[in-house]
Amino acid sequence: MKAQAVQKLDLAGCQAQLLVLLEEQFRLRMQHATGQLAKTSRLRTVRRDIARVRTAITVKKEAHS
């Protein structure tokens, strides 16, 4: 997910996207632990997407305060 796409989301959308990404990260970690994950680079991209969304949430909360 690109930073521009995250910035277009509202606060509720960002929080919903964060939950989706955290669930995906959990599934990927479990697949990696059991040796079923083919694209291990996906772990890195999901982790970075989570960071982007969390940053956007912080910025949006500070803007509303």
UniProtKB/Swiss-Prot annotation:
GO terms for biological process: translation. Transmembrane segments: none annotated. Disulfide bonds: none annotated. The keyword Ribosomal protein applies. GO terms for molecular function: structural constituent of ribosome. PROSITE patterns: RIBOSOMAL_L29 (PS00579). InterPro entries: Ribosomal_uL29 (IPR001854), Ribosomal_uL29_CS (IPR018254), Ribosomal_uL29_sf (IPR036049). Pfam families: Ribosomal_L29. Keywords: Ribonucleoprotein, Ribosomal protein. One of its GO terms (cellular component) is ribonucleoprotein complex. The keyword Ribonucleoprotein applies. Gene3D superfamilies: 6.10.140.1970. CDD domains: Ribosomal_L29_HIP. Belongs to the universal ribosomal protein uL29 family. This is Large ribosomal subunit protein uL29. It comes from Acidithiobacillus ferrooxidans (strain ATCC 23270 / DSM 14882 / CIP 104768 / NCIMB 8455).
